[in-house]
UniProtKB/Swiss-Prot annotation:
It comes from the Eukaryota. One of its GO terms (cellular component) is mitochondrial inner membrane. It is a multi-pass membrane protein. Belongs to the complex I subunit 4L family. This is NADH-ubiquinone oxidoreductase chain 4L. The chain crosses the membrane at residues 1-21, 30-50, 61-81. The gene is MT-ND4L. It comes from Pagophilus groenlandicus. GO terms for molecular function: NADH dehydrogenase (ubiquinone) activity. Core subunit of the mitochondrial membrane respiratory chain NADH dehydrogenase (Complex I) which catalyzes electron transfer from NADH through the respiratory chain, using ubiquinone as an electron acceptor. Part of the enzyme membrane arm which is embedded in the lipid bilayer and involved in proton translocation. GO terms for biological process: ATP synthesis coupled electron transport. InterPro entries: NADH_UbQ_OxRdtase_chain4L/K, NUOK/Mnh_C1-like. Its EC number is 7.1.1.2. Core subunit of respiratory chain NADH dehydrogenase (Complex I) which is composed of 45 different subunits. It catalyses: a ubiquinone + NADH + 5 H(+)(in) = a ubiquinol + NAD(+) + 4 H(+)(out).
Length: 98
């Protein structure tokens, strides 16, 4: 395993550990999810470029589109929860049920 793959994998693991440690706050969870998606994007892009997979060259762009949609939905949920309850605790999401 080259150093590039090791560093990207380490970034993914650190984001996953951050998600597990800071899971009580919504903002911290969203930042860790973005770190995971960014490391997956870089890993896919590097793998496709090194192995010359021309048919799979759209996969990182599709992943980036889904990451942007996830970030927008998460940010809107964060704004709604913080305006309603004043905090960004994940446990407040249970109170938003209709």
């Amino acid at each position: 395993m080259s150093m590039v793959y090791a560093n990207i994998f380490l970034a993914f693991i650190m984001s996953l550990m951050g998600l597990l440690v800071y899971r009580s706050h919504l903002m911290s969870s969203l930042l860790c999810l973005e770190g995971m998606m960014l490391s997956l994007f870089v890993m896919m892009t590097v793998t496709i470029l090194i192995n010359h997979f021309t048919l799979a060259s759209m996969a990182p762009i599709i992943l980036l589109v889904f990451a942007a949609c996830e970030a927008a939905l998460g940010l809107s949920l964060l704004v709604m929860v913080s305006n309603t309850y004043g905090t960004d605790y994940v446990q407040n999401l249970n109170l938003l049920q209709c």
